[in-house]
């Protein structure tokens, strides 16, 4: 039900610059020789940038709003603490702005055998150049926002708050846990480039790690809002009784889009469906 969300500017790239979505990318072998511009700095963008840099490609990463998160903290996987502290169980009534929460980028989390943290600092240490959010492409030039320092500072601030909440929970419930080591602030270049001429920079391909948009072309029902999104209340599609949704971001809980979070949502919606059927639905 999802399709890659690609900026309109992608259609203006010259024919000699490969345009690849994160969905189609499988390995560095999919990318021609030369420099690569990776657009998007959530988990997929970071992982692709790291792989390409490791394969010898000069890599530039366009960074917009992102959620920074370490793979491990205080001796355990960060997902363990999110579960233990109840953060993943937060529901619709626990957030002030549901629309904003549903549009927050996915965390910068990548699974590896050594459970190492892959973040912007790890990428710059590998030679990846950071620039701001991709803003467009005109006359051979890729353009970038000047907000890189601000978005990185905000991501660092939110990470500090999250780790502080975990520390407070541990102080109360398990004070003997080993102390936590906070990640260093994001190392932002002093003057990140705002424009790059792809030809002069030797950039031969662009990888769009810009997320996905819902594709409901198969669903012939009047159940969408003015932006084309499925209109529902906690997975209950009000405009079409008997129709339900599962797996959407923060459908009913913060964990709704995780495999381990779908079961609780499914139980709630099954209860709603059963009641509707008993009432004559």
Language-model features, listed with the residues they occupy:
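Flavin (primarily FAD) cofactor-binding/catalytic cores of flavoenzymes
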Residues: 1-281
